[in-house]
Structure formats: C-alpha cells, structure tokens
Amino acid sequence: MGLETEKADVQLFLDDDSYSHHGDVDFADPEKFADSDHDRDPHRLNSHLKVGFEDVIAEPMTTHSCDKVWICSHALFEISKYVMYKFLTVFLAIPLAFVAGILFATLSCLHIWIIMPFVKTCLMVLPSVQTIWKSVTDVIIAPLCTSVGRSFSSISLQLSHD
C-alpha cells in the first residue's frame, strides 16, 4: 500500500510489421519473443513434481534386468512423460486457466464485497449485542439458575443398605 520501490517485470514488444497505426491491433507472434531460460516456477510451488525415472522405477542390486531393457524403459518413460504432458497441456491448460481465473475472480469478489463487509458489520454490532446479552443474562438467566440451585440444594439423599 506504500511506495513501490521494485521495478516491475513487464516487457512490451512491438513489431513495425504487426503494429497497425489504423487502430486495428495485430499481435506479434509470441513464440518469437519466448524466453526459454525464464523460470516458470519462481516460488517453487511445484518442486515436489520433479520426478525422474529413478524416483519411480528402481531395481535392487540383487535383481537387475538386461541393460537394453533398462535403457529402453528409461527412454520410453521420459518420452511418454514429455509427450503426454505436452498433449494434456495443449488441451487442458487454457480451459483450466480460464476456470481458475473465474474461480479466483469470484472468490476475490465475494471476499471483498460480501464477506469483509459482513465481518466488519458484525464487529460493529457486537458491543451492542454484548450489552443486550449481559442484560438478558442478569435479568432472566441468573435468577432462574439461582432459583434452581437453591431448590436442588435443599434436597438431601439418604442411602440405606437393607
């Protein structure tokens, strides 16, 4: 909420060919400017997903398969993991990003415009409710509990073994 001292990491690329002076927006090819060295998980949210072949398939020292089987299975594991991830992201990344965006926007809106005003209203009203509750307790509940306590205190039980 104060003065921002860090530079924002924002880049804007305009091509002379793709920028139209007539008001029509033509975007440049994003692959042209893709930075393959950029860290896509800077906060290490998914560091636990770095799974290698040796983390999944392991043969003890006493039982080994043939070297060619081991090499082929390792290659097949890596290729299938790579291809399936690319395939799934092509079909699922954009729809899931859209759904996640809608979900987070909805939750943010509910939190900002409904939940926090409700909480603040409750906190403003609580002193009045506390005063009323104390009065109800002093006028109704305390005398009732005192009467019931006095009534039960006059009861005595005597046990006899016959």
From Swiss-Prot:
UniProtKB keywords: Cell membrane, Golgi apparatus, Membrane, Phosphoprotein
Domain of life: Eukaryota
Keyword Cell membrane: yes
Residue ranges annotated as intramembrane: 87-107
Subcellular location: Golgi apparatus membrane; Cell membrane; Membrane, Caveola
Modified sites of kind Phosphoserine: S20, S36
One Gene Ontology molecular-function label: protein homodimerization activity
Described purpose of this protein according to its UniProt entry: May act as a scaffolding protein within caveolar membranes. Interacts directly with G-protein alpha subunits and can functionally regulate their activity. Caveolin-2 may function as an accessory protein in conjunction with caveolin-1.
Subunit structure, interactors included: Homodimer. Caveolin-1 and -2 colocalize and form a stable hetero-oligomeric complex.
Family to which the UniProt record says this protein belongs: Belongs to the caveolin family.
Name used for this protein in its record: Caveolin-2
Gene name as annotated: CAV2
